[in-house]
């Protein structure tokens, strides 16, 4: 589960300006953290198919945000991929 402190830390490291909480970079970083958490969860709980479906939904949402960012600004896209270490 993504606790408030961790979420705030992610927002601070990826924000574009002081009051930024919803830019694509911030959203992608938060989704990536949730994906990492769920991946670790499935190593222990292999039969949790309900949450696995949620993971697939989150991955799709992140993919759509990345596609949007790639169309909008390629440099920002490359920077976020590099910073998060996402394979694309």
Curated annotation (Swiss-Prot):
Subunit structure: Part of the 30S ribosomal subunit. Forms a bridge to the 50S subunit in the 70S ribosome, contacting the 23S rRNA.
InterPro entries: Ribosomal_uS15, Ribosomal_uS15_bac-type, uS15_NS1_RNA-bd_sf
GO molecular function per UniProt: rRNA binding; structural constituent of ribosome
PROSITE patterns: RIBOSOMAL_S15 (PS00362)
CDD domains noted in UniProt: Ribosomal_S15p_S13e (cd00353)
Record's keyword annotation contains Zinc: no
GO BP annotation list: translation
Gene Ontology annotations for the cellular component aspect, listed alphabetically: cytosolic small ribosomal subunit
Provenance organism: Geobacter metallireducens (strain ATCC 53774 / DSM 7210 / GS-15)
Protein name (Swiss-Prot/TrEMBL): Small ribosomal subunit protein uS15
Keywords, comma-separated and alphabetical: Ribonucleoprotein, Ribosomal protein, RNA-binding, rRNA-binding
Gene3D superfamilies: 6.10.250.3130, S15/NS1, RNA-binding (1.10.287.10)
Stated role: One of the primary rRNA binding proteins, it binds directly to 16S rRNA where it helps nucleate assembly of the platform of the 30S subunit by binding and bridging several RNA helices of the 16S rRNA.
Family listed: Belongs to the universal ribosomal protein uS15 family.
């Amino acid at each position: 589960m993504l606790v408030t402190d961790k979420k705030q830390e992610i927002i601070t490291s990826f924000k574009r300006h002081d009051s930024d909480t919803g830019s694509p970079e911030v959203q992608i970083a938060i989704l990536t953290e949730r994906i990492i958490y769920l991946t670790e969860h499935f190593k222990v709980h292999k039969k949790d198919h309900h949450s696995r479906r949620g993971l697939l939904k989150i991955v799709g949402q992140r993919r759509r945000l990345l596609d949007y960012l790639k169309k909008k600004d390629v440099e920002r896209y490359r920077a976020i991929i590099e910073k998060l270490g996402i394979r694309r």
